[in-house]
Structure formats: structure tokens, C-alpha cells
Amino acid sequence: MDNRYFKRDISWLSFNYRVLLEAEDETLPLYERINFISIYSSNLEEFYKIRVADHKAIATGASQSDEETMQSAAELVDEINQEVNRQLEERIRIYEQKILPALRKHHIIFYQSRNVEPFHRDFVRSFFREEIFPYLAPVPVSKDKVISFLRDNRLYLAVRLHLKGAPASSPNRIQYFVMKLPYSKVPRFIQLPKVGKDYYLMFIEDIIKANLDTIFPGYEVDSSYCIKISRDADILIDDAANTSEIIEQVKKKVKKRKIGAVCRFVYDRAMPQDFLDFLVDAYRIDRWELVPGDKHLNMEDLRHLPNPNQSVRPIKKPQPMKLTCLDERESIFRYVEKKDLLLHYPYHSFDHFIHFLYEAVHEPTVREIMVTQYRVAENSTVINTLIAAAQNGKKVTVFVELKARFDEENNLATAEMMKAAGINIIFSIPGLKVHAKVALVLRRDKEGRKLTSYAYISTGNFNEKTATLYADSGLFTCNPVIVNDLHNLFRTLQGKENPVFHRLLVARFNLIPELNRLINHEIELTRQGKQGRIILKMNALQDPAMIDRLYEASQAGVEIDLIVRGICCLIPGQEYSHNIRVTRIVDTFLEHARVWYFGNGGAPKLFLGSPDWMRRNLYRRIEAVTPILDPDLKQELIDMLSIQLSDKRKACFVDDRLRNRWKSSRPQKEKVRSQYSFYEYLREKI
């Protein structure tokens, strides 16, 4: 790979490591710190199931790659595993030296490797017999015949036993078993009786380990260790498939996801080598699928950790605000007819968008509602409102993206439900994903004359649950050109060819040419002796062509600030990028908005929309970006970007070695914390 770019996957690991570092921040509530370990672990699980699984398929020749590509993929998997192993040491250090002592300060004691205290032994024994033992099903393992299938992302206990009384030379003396932990029946974390001021917790696997003699009478327990398998979860759809074929392929491949190829075998690193060798042979594990872990695996379960001590400082998040100008008795339609409206979630309530749809259901002059669906909540209020609109006589069209990873089943189910209610469903386009987050409400009077219509363009999904967790922005506008552009976009999704977009920037049509024009203009301004300025906020920056344009702008003297949460393949601080700074923000909410600023010689141009600057977004997806035309809303976005660039508590610089460099020494509560500062900024505007 060209050394002018960071490797995508190594850059992502740098981001995930930044997530882990939140667990060290002692200014945060303890259980919020614990939750960041859970997020880190969950992120890593998905990374292996998608990215590493793809590289492994290439490296093993499963994807019919040439020898050089296979070798490159194999080397990358090795590099990934080395970095993950390094991060494991940090995760263990933070958990054991920071989190567990902090829990103890609050009188919450985790039984770890040490034995259970005498005053809890009877409870642990009886709890095991009554609550756990009935759900255990030990399965013997042999090298010659594997009679157990290890399910994806399930925790197993591997046990080595010695048959009592068997001579040392007996081939049956040493036996191996595996057991799936039954925490669909029993919680992962068990609360033990309180003693004095102290609360006690125990992992379910540690309770099982303490009672192996009950499970295996007639055997001496040699040792036991946790293991887990991660399986390839990517779904590849034939680009040439038509709509009905896409539906069938998705249905079949979602079912096969649970039995996908192994991409990671995680094991307790304390396991003896001969024990590990036996399991590797028995389960036909490739050596490079081996990833050592801690004693306790599946640390994403920490999000379910009980908090028995109510005196522990709770996690307090800013509560979503409702704008007084959008009181439920007021019409969003009437407001937007007068002035564009910009909402920022989760600081503003997502109920405003639901209210917008609800008003469309009941407004007699509304004839049609059009929406894209990428990810929606289960039992979605958005979907239920659209169904109500169809039942109320409105024409409703929903584009459903079946290829939204891990949401395929939910999208299929909601599509079938909407179709049964009379909604016109458009399914995935062959060879493309539709990632745009847009909605359009069209009004006509009884005579068919067109009235004002309403467009909504967002950076986030129409999902009321993630709208409380992800930081996104969305624009309501009645601008007739934008409304007409959005109508053309929906026509394109229905098969119309050669659309023309005047204001909207749409990937695969006019987005790349317009981005190049905007960058060229900043370069030209700089050459004229004026100050070129670019600020780009996004989730990921990976496309080499656009990175090269930013390098070119930097070399011309354009000042560039990038606010990139995740993947960033651009290398700052080089001779070709000395005017580029990369800021990464990780805090309570997941930074998800895409907002772009071009200085334009003092008359700034601002945009928001759905795409990151990745190859897939810019060239293989339908994405929508809107200009912000209202001066007040422009200033609001400028202020948001300024606050984020001023963050000294949760923002760091990404340096030329992919290290997360704090902007100031931490912790300092008086420093700007952008998410909370922006919340206060918006609250003052209510």
C-alpha cells in the first residue's frame, strides 16, 4: 500500500483504542467507564467478523486472489493480531488496575482468581446446583471426532480431566469436554449476599469452575479455561442479482451467518500450550485464527454489570430538548414554510421528526410521503407512523435497503409489514447500497395544484433508539429546488435514468465533481493571497483520491481541520500535509454527523448529509448531501465545529504514527467538553 496513507484497518484499531482509553478517565461515572470497555470489546468482535474475515478469505485463496494479494492479506492479519494483542495488555491493565479497585472503593467486590470466601461457599454451591447445573450439557471432545459445533460469539468452558484410578499409561486417562455457558438462562454476573457494607459479584464461569467436581464425578479436574469462536458474518450479494434474487440471497445468507467460517478463536492466554494444541487440532483451527484473551472473555457483557450500590454516581446524559417553537400543538409544516429548521440529536428530541410524520398523516392536503430506510428500530415508531399514513389514504413510498449489515432481517420484516399495509416498497438496487437518509412530504390540494412540500435530509438513520445515542444533524426545508432535487432522487430510486440535481449533492452523480470544485476554489483563493479554509467532520476518511486532493490543498497553503471519529487514512504532519490537523472526539454520544465547511473567501459554504469519504460511500452508494442556505443555520453549524475544535477534554489529535495525542493534560473539568458545551449552546437558543 502507498505509504502516503495509513492502512484502513490499523487506523480503525487506533480509533477503537481511543474508545478503550475512556475507561481510564476518572472524571467519568464509574459505570460509564465500564461501559466503554464493553463498547471496545463489541467493536472488536464485529471487526473480526467482517474485516478480518474478509482478509482471511483472501489470504487462504477462498476469494480466488493472486499470490501477491494473498501474501499481503496474510501479513495484514498478522499486523492486526499484533496490535490487538498489544491493546489486550492495555485492556487488562485498565480493568485490573483501574476498574476493579474503583469498584472496591464503592464496596463492590468481584471474586476474580482468588477463592470464594468461606461465608459465600454454601451460597455459591446451592446457587450452582439449583440455577446453573440443570442447563449445563458437557460434550466430549476428541481429535478424531468433533461432536460439538461452537456457535458464534458464545462463551464455552473447555475442561481437561483425569479419570480417577486410570493408570498413567491409559489412553483414556486424559479427557476433554466443552460446555456452553447458559447465560440465556442465567445472568453472566451473579450477585452474592451482601456482607456488612460490601456487595459481591461473580462471573457465572467462575461459579461453574468452582463446582466442576459436581459435573464430573469420577474425574479429577486438571484445568479449565474459557474459549469462544467468532465467525464470518459478512454477506456478499451478487451484483448482477435482480430484486427478487437479492431478497432470496439475503434470506439464505442471513441464516448461514451463524455457521460462517471461523475468523477468530479466542482463548484464555493462561491455557497451557498442550491444552491449546489439542483444541486447535480438534476444531481444525488455523494458527492465525488464534487470538489470546484474558481469563474472562466476552467483555462486551460488562454493559449488563449490576450496580448493587445505589450510592455509586449514576451515568447522567444530557436529556433531549424539545424546541418551544415546535410545541406539539404547533405545526412543523407552518414553521418550516417560514424558515429552514436544523435539529441536532440527541440534544434535540427525535420526537420532532416523529411529529413531522404524524402531521403528514393527518394533514388533508398531503398526498404522498417518501422515505428511505437503512436502519430502523425494532417495533419502530417511524414505521408504525408510515403504516398509519397509508391506512389514512396517503400514498407512501419507502425505499428499503436490504443490504444494511446486521439489519437485513429487521428490514425484511418491516418491509413485509409495510407492504401488507399498502405501502409501496422499493427494494435494493443491484450493485448499490442506498445509504441516504432522506424524507419527502408532497402536498396537493383537491384540484391537484401543487402546494408547499417538505424535504428532510439527515446524517443519521430514522431510528428513535439510536437517536438517543448517536450525535447527528438533520435539516427540514421547503426550498423548492431542494424539494425538487429530492423528488428526482426518489424517482431515480424507482428506476428513472439521467437525473439532474441542482442543489443536492448525490453520490454517483454530482457529489465528486462538486467536492473537487469546492477544494479547487479554496486552493485558488490561497494562490490569490487569501486564506483558504476547509473543515470536514465525518466518521471515516479513506478514499485515496479525495485524500490526495486534501494533500494538494495543504501544499497550496489551505488550512484544513479534519474531525474524524473513526478510520482516517490521511497521514498528518508530513511535508505534503503540514497544514492538516486531525481531531478525534470520543465521548458519551457516538459522533456520527457529516458536516463540511468551505471558507469561500469569507462567505462560507456548509453542507450536511450521509456520506463519509470512503470509496464505498463516494462511488458505490447512493448518498445525499444538502447545502445549508439559511445564514442563522450556517452560523449554528460553524459554532458547532468551532466548539468541537476547542474541545480539550474528549478531543485528541491523531498524529503521524496513529497515536491519540491529548490536546491538553487530563483530567481538567474546566476545559471545553464539546458535547456538553454544544448542548448548553443549543439550550440557550431555545
Where do the language-model regions lie?
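Polyanion-binding catalytic cores of nucleic-acid enzymes and NTP/SAM-utilizing transferases
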Residues: 546, 550-552
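N-terminal localization/anchoring segments of enzymes in phospholipid and broader phosphate metabolism
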Residues: 1-534, 552, 556, 568-686
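Short alpha-helical
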Residues: 274, 544-545
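Hydrophobic alpha/beta core scaffold segments
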Residues: 559-563
